[in-house]
């Protein structure tokens, strides 16, 4: 006989099949070991490289503090989740085994128990039917059992997919968004069962895999279930660690010193504490519900119930176990309802944002009742888990006294659903019968809360009101007093300037002007009539010339070129916003690459400009489109800039980058960057460095992912003390935001920020990025913001006081457009503080439209250099402006200004115009221009023969008590997009002028004997009556 199964005389060492199985097991074990080793290497490489990157930026302590908190949260959460579920599974299996042992004992006793059976005159021992443990619930037959198991499995799969999906979202942020902070994950709800596969996108494979694992784990039982439990525990650990900042903010919360009018908590309670409780509730719900479903499924599938076609019923011990888990789920439901009480402060009902009359008098009390009722259910189930359930009818056991009928077991669920139904129906009835007939009276106190909270949350309460008549009389003397304002009126919009730059200044295909930004510089100027040199503020457009590697010819896109040669952009253009060169092209203060004296210098318009604008060697290693990593100081020189038909090469000598000075470091960087050519190239030297994460938007988001960032970084050229190589710096604004400010209305957003998801914002941080070295500095500018104060407490080494910013860079800070647009949009409604006016929307404003390149668009905020009237301003300053018109009319009603210079930074000024007088709005001015027969005829002539006229941004410029309207007109060929400034239209009072330059147009209006030969001056008297009738 063979000595073992599978062995025989022909196969003394085992059959080939067994050998193959053993070899396959060996390969599987080897693959598992290899996978673990690769994952471990990836983790080590990531931590090692990230540590070096943060160390390079002097933020190493920030990195390790995050790692410690994230690691601790992940380990604690994962261990608690794993331990809890494993304990529940072990208890379940023990109860199943005990039931099986009792049944086996009953069968054994039945076999040997003598039962007297009479056969004739003798008694024979016959086996009696086995009497096992009595079930405490009715048995389930296959037609009921199978659908029940399928439904529970689907819910379990959906739960796993849900948490995997939201965890992937947390850990894969979109760095193109202004805010990458993840939203608070909502607790799992059954409706996700029907939406599991919608919106998955690229994560569909991962989530489907998680669902398959859940299904296989349930179907195959204990073998795969521990692996699934481990994966889900890791998912929960990652989910909570991805929300690490919520715990830190809760621990380091700062008071707002403002009390909400309903629950009388400080606002900090809603912004710092509630999100943490919502996060924990989401985790607890998933943990307890998964345990409940898993335990129930294990019991239902025990004793081969599916193959037998019958489940005998739950035992008393099993029902106690399920009751305990049900109590935990009910407890989380009670916590959710308790937290939802606070959600009414953020409800949007149309008339009132926040809790309204119906919420306070009906929905809120019912929500409190639901919370108490859910907790009562939890207590009841907890009591049953200790005392046990009564045995159900139909189980073969006698009915016990006081036993609840079967309907009584479902009564709490029915009552809970009935309360939910009454909450909705009662709210609808109260709204219809009580509120709507007397809405203003009922909602008055809640409208007051809404107005006050929104103005506070968006910082509208700091706006200083002022009145502008718009009826002042400008004279040549007053124009001369405001000469600096006139010299800085913007004639060049960023779009046509960029088009011109791309035609004339890109120089090579691989250079790109991705953006042009408005700023101001102090330049040296010489008066025409004297040799006196003075300084003056000049508004400019600056456009960096960055390197776009994707534009390199495809055949030249090699690994060496991508990472060693094409490493940086070079230079910028600087154009005054008001000057025009020959042929209507932009006038440049700074342009080109290379001069007769220095091949690497940028060409300036004059020596005075060269001494006013720091240029140096303007290499851009860190920018808005520098998306690839590079290695510097290699054996291959870097392309520096083109010179004629040849190229000039250079080696990087800045502070940026991490040394690749050891084989281990090369290996870890190769793993991190997934670039194995780094290991085999022979071009590296001992002082070779790697520069990665060079996109400034990705760079700052990786350091401070908890901030919201402005979408328009702008380049500044400045000389900073102690910096020899760097003259180019990026300035970026950052915000602290929250969506948890009670009664504050976030609005619907605007063209720049559709779907706004915050209802509190402060411009608290200015960020400085060195375009050459990559250094990053965060400066706090708002000491009154509790959110930034909390982050300063968490990361004191990350933030610097604004006073420490170099003075040459302070002169270039500006009030950000994103912040200003948000406040401007909120001011459309929330300038109305009178409750009756607010309710009726009697004074609702809107942002007017303008025609730009034949398309209608809202007038965007624009920067000006001007002297603000009515506030005793001593000199012109850099301001940001937005115009308003009434909701149903087109006349001008208000102008909002934000002051940008350091000494007045952040102050807002709102000029309102008299409602009883007609003051032309931008849409009316455009209508006047377009309907004037002479001007419209000229524009029609330009729109022929392969060209088109483009009406640029219309600017409304207050000068003393008067308003000046200026609109540039560009001429652009349809085939070759090279816009030129063709004419400038100026409107003042009852006259409209169109000339080749701004000075000529102004002169044509104010000088009775203008020198401009081509100026067109037209009266507006013929159209005033039409516009007046529009107001009536």
Swiss-Prot record:
Top-level division of the source organism's lineage: Bacteria
InterPro entries: UPF0182
Keyword annotations: Cell membrane, Membrane, Transmembrane, Transmembrane helix
Listed transmembrane segments: 27-49, 69-87, 144-166, 197-219, 226-248, 283-300, 321-339, 364-386, 406-428
Compartment(s) where it occurs, according to its Swiss-Prot or TrEMBL record: Cell membrane
Entry similarity comment: Belongs to the UPF0182 family.
Protein name in the entry: UPF0182 protein sll1060
Annotated source species: Synechocystis sp. (strain ATCC 27184 / PCC 6803 / Kazusa)
């Amino acid at each position: 006989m063979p000595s073992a199964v599978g062995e025989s005389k022909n196969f003394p060492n085992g059959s080939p099949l067994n050998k193959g199985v053993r070899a396959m097991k060996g390969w599987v074990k080897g693959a598992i070991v290899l996978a673990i080793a690769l994952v471990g290497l990836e983790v080590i490489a990531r931590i090692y490289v990230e540590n070096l990157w943060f160390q390079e930026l002097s933020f190493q302590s920030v990195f390790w503090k995050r790692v410690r908190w994230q690691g601790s949260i992940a380990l604690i959460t994962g261990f608690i989740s794993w331990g809890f579920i494993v304990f529940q599974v072990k208890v379940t299996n023990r109860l199943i085994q005990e039931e099986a042992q009792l049944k086996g004992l009953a069968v054994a006793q039945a076999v040997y128990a003598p039962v007297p059976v009479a056969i004739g005159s003798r008694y024979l021992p016959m086996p009696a039917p086995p009497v096992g443990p009595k079930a405490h619930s009715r048995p389930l037959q296959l037609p009921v059992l199978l659908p029940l198991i399928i439904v529970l499995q689907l819910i379990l799969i959906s739960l796993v997919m849900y948490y995997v999906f939201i965890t992937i979202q947390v850990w894969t942020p979109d760095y193109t968004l202004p805010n990458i902070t993840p939203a608070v994950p909502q607790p799992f709800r059954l409706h996700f069962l029907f939406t599991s596969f919608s919106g998955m996108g690229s994560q569909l494979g991962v989530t489907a895999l998680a669902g398959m694992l859940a299904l296989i784990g349930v179907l195959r039982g204990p073998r795969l279930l521990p692996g699934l439990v481990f994966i889900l525990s890791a998912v929960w650990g990652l989910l909570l660690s991805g929300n690490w900042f919520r715990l830190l903010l809760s621990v380091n919360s700062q008071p707002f010193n403002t009390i909400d009018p309903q629950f009388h908590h400080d606002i900090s309670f809603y912004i710092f504490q509630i999100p943490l409780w919502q996060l924990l509730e989401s985790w607890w719900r998933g943990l307890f519900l998964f345990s409940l479903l898993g335990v129930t499924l294990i019991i239902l599938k025990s004793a081969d119930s599916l193959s037998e076609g019958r489940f005998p019923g739950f035992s008393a011990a099993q029902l106690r176990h399920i009751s305990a888990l049900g109590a935990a789920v009910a407890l989380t439901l009670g916590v959710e309802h308790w937290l939802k009480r606070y959600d009414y402060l953020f409800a949007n009902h149309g008339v009132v944002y926040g809790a309204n009359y119906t919420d306070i008098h009906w929905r809120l009390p019912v929500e409190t009742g639901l919370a108490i009722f859910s907790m009562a259910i939890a207590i009841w189930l907890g009591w049953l888990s200790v005392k046990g359930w009564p045995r159900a009818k139909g189980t073969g056991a006698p009915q016990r006294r006081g036993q609840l009928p079967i309907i009584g077991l479902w009564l709490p669920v029915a009552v809970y659903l009935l309360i939910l139904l009454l909450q909705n129906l009662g709210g609808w009835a109260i709204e219809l019968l009580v509120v709507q007939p007397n809405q203003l009276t009922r909602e008055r106190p809640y409208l007051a809360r809404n107005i006050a909270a929104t103005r506070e949350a968006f910082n509208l309460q700091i706006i200083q009101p002022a009145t502008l008549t718009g009826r002042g009389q400008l004279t040549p003397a007053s124009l001369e007093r405001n000469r600096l304002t006139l010299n800085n009126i913007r004639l060049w919009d960023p779009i046509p300037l960029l088009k011109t730059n791309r035609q004339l200044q890109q120089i090579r295909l691989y250079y790109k002007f991705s953006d042009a930004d408005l700023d101001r510089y102090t330049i040296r100027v010489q008066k025409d009539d004297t040799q006196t040199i003075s300084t003056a503020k000049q508004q400019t457009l600056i456009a960096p010339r960055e390197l776009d590697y994707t534009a390199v010819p495809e055949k030249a896109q090699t690994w060496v070129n991508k990472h060693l040669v094409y490493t940086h952009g070079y230079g910028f253009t600087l154009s005054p916003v008001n000057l025009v060169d020959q042929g209507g092209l932009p006038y440049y203060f700074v342009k080109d690459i290379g001069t007769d004296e220095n091949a690497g210098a940028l060409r300036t318009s004059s020596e005075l400009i060269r001494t006013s604008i720091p240029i140096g060697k303007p290499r851009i290693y860190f920018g808005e489109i520098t998306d690839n990593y590079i290695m510097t100081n290699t054996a291959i020189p870097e392309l520096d800039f083109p010179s004629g038909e040849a190229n000039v090469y250079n080696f990087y000598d800045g502070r940026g980058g991490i040394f690749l000075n050891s084989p281990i470091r090369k290996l870890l960087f190769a793993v991190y960057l997934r670039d194995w050519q780094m290991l085999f190239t022979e071009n590296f030297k001992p002082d070779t460095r790697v520069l990665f994460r060079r996109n400034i938007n990705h760079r700052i988001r990786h350091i401070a992912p908890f901030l919201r960032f402005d979408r328009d970084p702008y380049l500044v050229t400045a000389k900073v003390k102690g910096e020899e190589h760097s003259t180019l710096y990026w300035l970026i604004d950052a915000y602290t935001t929250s969506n948890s400010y009670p009664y504050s209305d976030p609005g619907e957003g605007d063209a720049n920020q559709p779907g706004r998801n915050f209802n509190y914002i402060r411009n608290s941080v200015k960020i400085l990025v060195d375009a050459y070295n990559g250094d990053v500095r965060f400066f706090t500018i708002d000491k009154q913001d509790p959110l930034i104060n909390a982050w300063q407490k968490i990361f004191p080494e990350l933030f610097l006081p604004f006073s420490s910013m170099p003075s040459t860079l302070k002169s270039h800070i500006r009030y950000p457009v994103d912040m200003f647009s948000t406040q401007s949009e909120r001011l459309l409604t929330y300038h109305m503080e009178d409750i009756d006016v607010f309710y009726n929307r009697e004074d609702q404003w809107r942002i007017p439209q303008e025609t730009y390149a034949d398309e209608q668009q809202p007038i965007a905020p624009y920067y000006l250099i001007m002297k603000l009237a009515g506030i005793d301003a001593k000199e012109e300053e850099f301001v940001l402006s937005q115009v308003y018109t009434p909701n149903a009319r087109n006349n001008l009603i208000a102008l909002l200004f934000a002051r940008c210079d350091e000494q007045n930074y952040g102050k807002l000024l709102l000029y309102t115009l008299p409602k009883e007088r007609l003051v032309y709005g931008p849409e009316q001015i455009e209508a006047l221009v377009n309907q004037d027969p002479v001007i419209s005829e000229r524009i029609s002539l330009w729109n022929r023969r392969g060209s088109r006229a483009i009406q640029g941004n219309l600017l409304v410029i207050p000068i003393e008590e008067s308003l000046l309207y200026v609109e540039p007109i560009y001429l652009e060929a349809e085939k070759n997009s090279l816009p030129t400034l063709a004419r400038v239209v100026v409107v003042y009072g009852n006259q409209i002028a169109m000339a080749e330059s701004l000075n000529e147009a102004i002169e044509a209006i104010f000088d009775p004997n203008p020198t401009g030969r081509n100026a067109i001056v037209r009266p507006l008297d013929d159209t005033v009556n039409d516009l007046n009738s529009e107001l009536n």
